[in-house]
Amino acid sequence: MVENAGGSELAAVLQALADPARLRVVEALSRSPQRAGDLAAAAGVPAPTMSKHLRVLLAAGIVTDERGARDARVRVFRLRRESVVAVRAWLDQVQARWDEQLRAFKAHVEREGRR
């Protein structure tokens, strides 16, 4: 999903996550797979709005869907672990660079303070 951390795939994932209702969907799916109607209730949005949110999350590769075993009309949505891992890896890289910059700044200030 996010092989190139600076690429358009990561941007699509972050853009998809930039909506509070979609964040609530991701939180709900992190607990268990769910149907669209249940997700709409959890996110506090009407069913048609949830359908739009789910299309965005599917297109970004954040969730997957499958047809219900007993009823093919029912779709069950699941969070893709890979999408969460990829975003976390990118954030960890950004944090590591930031931490390195802070260490370098601290060392600089300490050197200057000794003069």
What are these regions (language model features)?
Residues 54-55:
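Short, hydrophobic-biased segments on the C-terminal half of alpha helices
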Residues 35, 46, 63, 107-110:
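Charge-dense, helix-prone N-terminal extensions
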Residues 1-8, 27, 82-115:
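Amphipathic alpha-helical dimerization/coiled-coil segments
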Residues 2, 8-49, 74-85:
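N-terminal helix-turn-helix DNA-binding core of bacterial DNA-binding proteins
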